[in-house]
Amino acid sequence: IWYQFVFEDGTKFNYSGNEEEMEKQISAISPDDVKGYIKLVNFTKKIFEKGYLELSDVPFTKPFFMMKQIPSLLKLKSYKSVYSLVSSYVKHEKLRRILSMHPLLVGGNPFTTTSIYGLILYLEKKWGIHYSMGGTGNIIKGLETLMNEENIKIKKGFEVNKIISNGKTIKGIRLENGDEISANNVVCNADPPDVYERLLNKKDLNFFFNFKRKRMDYSMGLFVYYFGTKKVYKDVAHHTIKFGNKYKEHLDDIFDKKKLNDDISYYLHRPTATDNSMAPDGCDCFYVLVPVPNNQSNINWSESGEKIKNLVIDKMEKDLLPNLRENIIEDFYLTPDYFEKDLNTKFGSGFSIQPKFTQSAYFRFHNKSEIYDGLYFVGAGTHPGAGVPGVLSSAKVLDKIL
């Protein structure tokens, strides 16, 4: 299975690429929704073909190119949210939650994220769910190996604290130790809103760019709790998503009201289900990710972090991992403060700006800076967006620009 979904009433749904099994489980919940599910998958195939195969690695730097796409995007119901699109095909609330959850994987609210992101549903159907053996860090190691093979010099351990410009022409970067490196082109994988605010001269930013920048909506924050256990929980899937009692209300609290509540939903990652090298023999390892408000909330995470940790341990102990607390041997957690202070994301958001229609493609921060000659962006805040496939695709976009 790809994901196991768990509901408060104990219902479990094993989400996979086996369509026969999928339809059987859907029928057990709501027989009338099987046909709607099939139609939904077929519709998301059309979105995938346009939004991913055709546009995910294409630069959106010119308004005319964006305008050319509008008729096709409207035909694909891009004006609807993912939840609204799913709801037009299936009626049972549990199925609506399961089939509309994908925007959360890229920092979006299913109730406001454009239905174009419904393409993730079909992307998984086409190519499956993949895991980097040894952890996601091995993707970075692989890229480093490739760079070394191409004789690209890598300088580690120095934070960039200034991008140097002469007027609106990029001249290089300054490191935290004071060293300067001259360059005509700077490719930046940091969060664009933070870069424009902190590393560049704000006087260079024009009225229209500032107007757009200051009105952007940011993705949720993340509470991420890593823990190892002296017990193996062999029946727990690699990916588990547990829904709280309320769905929309919980998302409203996170994205709009910017407040915490106890009725949490969470995602539990157990890599040892696939890769037993991730924990010693007889042990298990996990992280649990809880969507929380970003730092626009002004939440004191030094106080709230410990409360959420204990809350989520209690929930997991009840839902999936019996006697968890007594079996934890190593643990630590990260809050939006880590994302803001260590990773320099604006407001500690986990995925940069939200993937709403008005913040997608041309309306995101451009891969080729709108302000500076010689400044380019890759990563979650630029086109096409967050998530490993999106971030890696942003490099493909840049390859077509440079």
Task: Indicate where each model-derived feature is located.
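N-terminal FAD cofactor-binding segment of flavoenzymes
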Residues: 1-2
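Rossmann-like flavin
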Residues: 8-112
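A glycine-rich dinucleotide-binding beta-alpha-beta segment and adjacent secondary-structure elements
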Residues: 92-106, 263-269, 322-384
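Active-site-adjacent "gating/activation" loops or surface patches in catalytic cores
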Residues: 98-126, 130, 369-373
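Helical element adjacent to the flavin cofactor pocket in flavoenzyme catalytic cores
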Residues: 119-177, 184
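Mid-domain catalytic core of redox enzymes
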Residues: 161-280
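C-terminal segments that line or cap access tunnels to active or ligand-binding sites in enzymes
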Residues: 230-340
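A conserved FAD-binding loop/helix module that cradles the flavin
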Residues: 380-402
